[in-house]
Each structure stands twice: as C-alpha cells, then as structure tokens.
C-alpha cells in the first residue's frame, strides 16, 4: 500500500465471489412479491397530507387546530452545554418531535451566550439547528432586560436570517445581584411593540402568563392587566409559567377571559422529575409547592425512580383534567431535555401521534418556513440529510417539482465542525468497536461493509449500524432487503457500496418498503448503485457499458481530486431516479442523479474515509495506511439502470467487468 509499502489494494480482485443470480426483478409491491421481507415496525399507512404547502405561521396553525378541536402538544428545551452533546440533543429533539409536536422552543440561556450565532451551543444556534435538522417549527425565547432596543432588534434580525419566525417575548430574569434600575428596564411589552413596529406580522409572537401572578408584580390583578397589554400590543398566544394545581390554571383562564384576553392560553407543564430539582426550580420561579405534594414526596424523596413515577402520574392526571374540561387547548411540556417520561406522558394522554407516512423518500421539512416547498433532492445525500441541509442552508429557495437544468448548484462547504461533531455516532471508540480496532488488510474493510448490510455482529459481537457515509444509527433501509444478496456480493468482490436502490415498477404508495406520498398512488424507481472501486475495475466497467449498454446504463466515475472524471450523462441534465404518480396531482420526482451535484458530493464522500474512519487510527499504523490507500486509489462510481421495467443489469455489468479484468 501507499503508506506501508505493502501490496496495493487492487489485488483484492484475485478471487471472484459467485452467487446464484445477480439479476433483480423490478419490485411491484409487497402484495405481489412473495420474497419481500417486511419488518413488524413497518406499517402500511401512508400520508393523508403529503404535498408541500406554503408555510403556516405558528399562531395560525395553533388557531386552526383549536378551531378543528384537535388537541396538540409542544415541547421546551434548553441548549446543551458542550459541543459534543449537540448531536445527541438534536436526535432527542427529533425523536420527540416525531410524535407530532406542533412546535418546539429553545430557552434564551444566558450561560450559552444566547445571541452569538458563531457559537455552536448558543440558544440562537441551537434553535436554528432544531429548525433545520429536526424539521419542526421552532420558537426562540428572547429576553430584553439585559439589552437596549438596538441589541434586541439585532437579535430579531439574526433570528429572521436563520429562518426562525416564532418568538417568545420575555423580559428575562435579572442577573444575580442586579436591581431593575441597574438594567435598561425594557420589558416584554416593549419587545412586542418593537417587533410589530419593525416587522409587522412576519413573526408569530408568544408571551408569558403567570397563573399566580408575576412575583414582582404589584398584584395578581395588575399582572393580568399587564398580560392584556401584551396581547393588545400584538402577542398571538400565551404560554404560562409552571404551576402545580389544575385549579390554578382554570381560574387564571377564567380571569383572563373576563378582562377581554381572547388569545389562546397554553398551560406550561413541568413534570416532577426529581425531589431536589423541583424544589430548586420552584425557588428560582418564586413559587410555593403545595404542602400535600411535599407530603407525598417526603417518604420517597431519596428514591429517584419513585419520585419520577409520582411526578409522571400526577402530571398525566392534571393534564387530562385540563384537556377533558376544555380549559387547555394543548399542553406545553418543559422537558428539561429529558425524553422517557415526556414520551410516557404524551402517550398516556393520547397526544403522541407517530407519523407513519413518508411525504417523500426523504424527510420533508414541512414546518420549515423556507424548505416547506422543497420537493427534489440529489440522491447522493440520502443517508446524510443533515449534511445536505448544512450545505444548502444559504439557499433562499429550493427546487419544487423538478430539479431543472442546473448550471452550477451552489453547495456550501462542509465545515470541519460538521465533519467532526454533527455526526450521529457518539465517539471514536464506538466507531472503532464497529469497524475494528485494527485493520490489517483490505479484507477487513470489506467485512465492515458486509456486516453493515447483513447486520450480523462483527468478530467482537458488535453490530455495524452506521458507515462513514450514513448519519443515523439505524442500519440499512427496509428496501435494501430486496437487493441485499447482490450488495453483499459486491462488497465480497471489493466493490464497496455506499448507496443503492432497487428498481420499482408501480408499487402502491402505501407499500411498506418503498411507498411514499398520497394514498392511491404508484411509486417508481430506477435501479441505482453508488460504490468505491479500483481504477482498473472502473476502466473495465466503462468499456463494457459503452460497448454493450450505452443507452440503458448511465455512469459517472471520479477520483479523489477529479483528475479522473468521466460520465456518459448530459452535464447539466439531471436524471430522475425516483418518481410517483398520484390522484389529482402532477408527477412527482423527488430524487435525481445530477453530474454537477455529484462533484460536490465527491469532496464529502472522500473526506468521510478519513474524517470518520482513518483518522481514528495513529497515522503511522497499518490501519491508517489501509484506509488511506482506499481513499487515495479507489474511484467513486455511480450507476443508473434506465430500464425499470426489466430485470436490472447493474450487477451483471459488474460481473462482466470482474470477469474481463480477471482474464
């Protein structure tokens, strides 16, 4: 190898592995394919509302749901303290939001340097990441007591630039040891007025309500009148401070309605998750915990599990009462960045509604103000959606309906932060457990790919649930089962597969393996394969395609620095590889192959070899040398079989290339 002086990686083609059949028939749906394997977790449900729509402002969505008498929930989070905690945090937000959260919000945490958009863990940066990567409408808390008007307007402009269109306007807590007269003395009412004066109706504005009155207000009645002033100034809805008794919220709502507050009032609920934590939070909020709750907690205060069980059950009981009697249109849960008990509460209340539909083969960001109309993506980022979002973050519009004849798609660079910190796998140790602490030869590399496809444990008993080119630790996609035998064959023969899809000819849109879109439709796919292979094999492959399949098979082969770059596709014409036909709709083509986008993907695909694998080993080690040799010597190749109605020839073409190379 290049780094160790050993034989080159390409000698792996010495012995060609065989299987009974490389041909794969077009898939027509699980009901007609007796060989299709469907996991129990896959459902046959499809989307009721599947097409992209114009963005609906948060307060408009809340009002619509209330008018339709649909109960809903929302979730509050605070920013993670450390950069390496961001991936786990975003995963947690995404998992919880998949239960149907109408919105999530992010606190204005002064310790995070909240307005610093250059700091990964700031409130502003995390809110933008929640919106972009989790695809759920995100409201940013914003305080003004520490700032002047110019500062606050700057913060609002930053929020607008990041795509955020919902603000929870707050005065904010005074810094410890600070009196109100020592600050700028601006309050939430001032911010609400500034927003409406400067931005009109661009933002949805939430404001805080205090069911027992703000602790610094002259009186409960005075605080109610101040809340009415905030609503009259332009606040669209109210989210309350935490409380401990259902009666407290019920009285508060009655009192608000009596003085003419008509905006939706959403109860803010904090489940008791720990004895000391709830006492600390109550003290910070200047609230008294009812004596009967303290009495209940006293005998179990040292048993964390018992306290959490009590808190969960009490929360469910209180929320159910408020929802059943119609006082609360929804529930806003203060999650404290926890997941388990929050999910249990929502399921018990019947609010958890796991979405079973796929609007597109990739996750549609229907609640994103800008991406909500996006309907087409290049296939290369199928398993790295966060990367795609990062690299297209600065786009002010997204392809809708068709990718079009592109001349220069402006993909941003993947920053070193993204490469190292926004991945899903926790750390190098986890990855090495999957890939192997020692890579002695190319055979070890092939085995990693094979174990990923088969999901068989490796020699150390660890499953390979992720590759450098995938973000989610979920293993292969369900549709991979249709071609898994052929993919294993590829990797056994040194053709390292990183992306693929089988041909599909009119599978129902409700199909559990490949279905997407509106019910009553039909889905189609061209067979696609993306892989790394030796230069010699790619040369032979190109010869065979140009000789025997010049029209049927499109290829694109490229090396790490583009000194080799060859394709038989039109340079600026994309190829639709996934499309659907649905009742009353235009044909949708959500996934394409595009030569110019592929060149942008090439940089990232090669970087992943080292950033997410090779660099975990010492540079002088054999393991590093093996990975570096593959990175340096192998070409990245894509193949498209344009005839989706006949058995795919992609694997047969690869077999021919291997056979001719062997001669």
Curated annotation (Swiss-Prot):
Co-factor(s): FAD
SUPFAM superfamilies according to UniProt: FAD-linked oxidoreductase (SSF51730)
Name under which the protein is recorded: Probable methylenetetrahydrofolate reductase (NADPH)
Keywords assigned: FAD, Flavoprotein, NADP, Oxidoreductase, Phosphoprotein
PTM sites of type Phosphothreonine: 107, 465
Phosphoserine PTM sites in chain numbering: 408
EC numbers on record: 1.5.1.53
Gene this chain is encoded by: mthf-1
Single GO biological process annotation from the record: methionine biosynthetic process
Record family assignment: Belongs to the methylenetetrahydrofolate reductase family.
InterPro entries with a match to the protein in the record: FAD-linked_oxidoreductase-like, Fadh2_euk, Mehydrof_redctse-like, MTHFR_C
């Amino acid at each position: 190898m290049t780094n160790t002086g050993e034989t080159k990686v390409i000698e792996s083609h010495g012995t060609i592995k065989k299987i009974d059949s490389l041909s794969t028939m077009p898939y027509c749906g699980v009901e007609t394919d007796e060989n299709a394997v469907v996991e129990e977790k896959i459902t046959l449900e499809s989307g009721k509302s599947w097409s992209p729509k114009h963005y609906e402002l948060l307060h408009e969505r809340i009002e619509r749901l209330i008018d339709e008498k649909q109960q809903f929930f929302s979730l509050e989070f605070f920013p993670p303290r450390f950069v390496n905690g961001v991936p786990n945090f975003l995963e947690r937000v995404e998992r919880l939001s998949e239960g149907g959260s109408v919105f999530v919000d992010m606190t204005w945490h002064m310790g995070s340097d909240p307005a610093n958009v250059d700091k990964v863990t700031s409130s502003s940066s995390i809110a933008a990441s929640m919106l972009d990567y989790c695809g759920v409408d995100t409201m940013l808390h914003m305080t003004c007591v520490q700032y002047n008007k110019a500062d606050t307007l700057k913060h609002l402009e930053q929020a607008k630039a990041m795509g955020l269109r919902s603000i929870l306007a707050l005065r904010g807590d005074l810094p410890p040891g600070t009196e109100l007269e020592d600050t700028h003395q601006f309050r939430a009412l001032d911010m609400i007025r500034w927003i409406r004066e400067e931005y009109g109706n661009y933002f949805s504005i939430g404001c805080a309500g205090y069911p027992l009155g703000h602790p610094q207000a002259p009186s409960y009645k005075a605080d109610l009148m101040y809340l009415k002033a905030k609503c009259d100034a332009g606040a669209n809805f109210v989210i309350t401070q935490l409380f401990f008794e259902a009666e407290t919220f019920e009285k508060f709502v009655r009192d608000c309605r009596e003085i003419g507050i008509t905006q939706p009032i959403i109860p803010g609920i904090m489940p008791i998750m720990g004895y000391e934590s709830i006492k600390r939070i109550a003290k910070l909020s200047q609230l008294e915990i009812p004596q009967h709750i303290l009495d209940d907690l006293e005998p179990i205060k040292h048993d964390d599990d018992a306290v959490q069980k009590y808190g969960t059950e009490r929360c469910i009981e209180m929320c159910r009462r408020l929802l059943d009697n119609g006082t609360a249109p929804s529930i806003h849960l203060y999650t404290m960045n926890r997941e388990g008990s929050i999910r249990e509460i929502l399921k018990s209340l019947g609010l958890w509604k796991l979405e079973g539909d796929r609007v597109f083969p990739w996750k549609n960001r229907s609640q994103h103000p800008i991406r909500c109309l996006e309907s087409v993506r290049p296939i290369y980022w199928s398993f790295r959606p966060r990367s795609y979002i990062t690299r297209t973050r600065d786009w002010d519009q997204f392809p809708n309906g068709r990718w079009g004849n592109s001349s220069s798609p402006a993909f941003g660079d993947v920053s070193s932060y993204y490469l190292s910190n926004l991945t899903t796998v926790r750390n190098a140790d986890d990855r090495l457990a999957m890939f192997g602490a020692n890579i002695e030869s190319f055979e070890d590399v092939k085995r990693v790919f094979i174990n990923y496809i088969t999901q068989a444990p490796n020699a150390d008993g660890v499953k390979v649930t992720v590759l450098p080119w995938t973000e989610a630790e979920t293993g292969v996609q369900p549709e991979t089962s249709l071609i898994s035998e052929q993919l294993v064959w590829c990797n056994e023969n040194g053709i390292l597969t990183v992306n693929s899809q089988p041909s599909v000819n009119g599978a129902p849109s409700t199909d559990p393996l490949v279905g997407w879109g509106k019910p009553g439709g039909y889905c189609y796919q061209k067979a696609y394969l993306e892989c790394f292979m030796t230069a010699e094999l790619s040369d032979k492959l190109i010869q065979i395609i140009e000789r025997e399949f010049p029209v049927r098979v499109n290829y694109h082969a490229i090396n790490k620095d583009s000194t080799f770059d060859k394709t038989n596709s039109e340079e600026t014409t994309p190829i639709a590889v996934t499309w659907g036909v649905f009742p009353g709709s235009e044909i949708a083509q959500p996934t394409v192959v595009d030569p110019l986008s592929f060149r942008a993907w090439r940089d990232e695909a090669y970087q992943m070899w080292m950033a997410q694998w090779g660099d975990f080993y010492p540079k002088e080690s054999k393991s590093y040398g093996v990975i570096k040799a593959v990175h340096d010597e192998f070409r990245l190749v894509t193949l498209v079989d344009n005839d989706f109605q006949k058995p795919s020839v992609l694997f047969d073409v690869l077999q021919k290339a291997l056979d001719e190379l062997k001669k």
